[in-house]
Amino acid sequence: MGRETILFSSEEKKDLQDVAEFLHQLADKLAENNVIFRRGTEELVVEIPNNVVLEIKVEEELKRDKTQQSLEIEIEWIVGETDSGGVELG
């Protein structure tokens, strides 16, 4: 198993409309293959290839007297991996 390094992390309470607006902006940046995350003076530029793996999870966790649900959206790729173009017949 490889080693994981967190390059940028953020968690904050937001109004659902603000989250939707952020996701729209993120989608626009993904379409450009380039996302810049900023917080204060911290900045991370992420180059995203055309071929990625999209993982979506909806989870439910029971806590004492509450149930917590979450929606996770994860986009993964291998750095430097190029699209093989799939199988071709010759």
Name each model-derived stretch.
Residues 2-6, 44-55, 59-90:
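Long protein-protein interaction modules used by eukaryotic assembly/scaffold proteins
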Residues 1-28:
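Terminal, regulation- and interaction-focused segments at domain boundaries
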Residues 26-30, 38-44:
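Extracellular/virion structural assembly segments
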Residues 33:
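Short beta-strand/loop motifs in extracellular/secreted proteins, especially
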